Amino acid sequence: MEISHVNIILFSLDTVRADHLSCYGYPRLTSPHLDRVAQQGAMLLDFYSPHIPTYPGHTTMMTGRDVYAHHVTGQSTAFEPTPGIPMLAEILRQDGYRTYAADTLGRWFARGFDVYEGYEWSKEEPRHWRAGETVTSVALNLLDRAVTEGGPFFMFVHYWDAHTPYYPPPPFDRAFYARDERDPANRSM
């Protein structure tokens, strides 16, 4: 029996809570575009991060191993996954997938990707991550490339915009609390 390879796109919205996304039942319309993607694809209903912060949690997601097995226990490039533990992109590449990533961070998750479009942090930059619009633009270019090259592909798209510091652009800056955000009675955050 021949196994069909489906294309896989894994979106990671760093620090976004599923219970605040409308596709997961939140009563406010907070994620209309993601809702449309979710209607056409697969959604995980019970998915929990095994560790914080980002690097250990995502390494577990990419290896299927706990932090005590892969040894990424902190938020630094000083930590590398244990040699010999395959990353998801490596496994899929061995199975015939081409692998692409549009990441908001540096090269934390680059192992196993044929094309990894990361972002090098700079102390001169006012924010140390790539804006979502840029990640989306990079991802769409990679998607065009993947389709043109043909065959099955895996793409990892990693957004950081919802991460601290919380500076949403207008009009979203007042979507949940329209009064003085310094008011001690403000319990919206």
Which residue stretches match the model-derived regions?
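Catalytic domains that recognize anionic headgroups
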Residues: 1-189
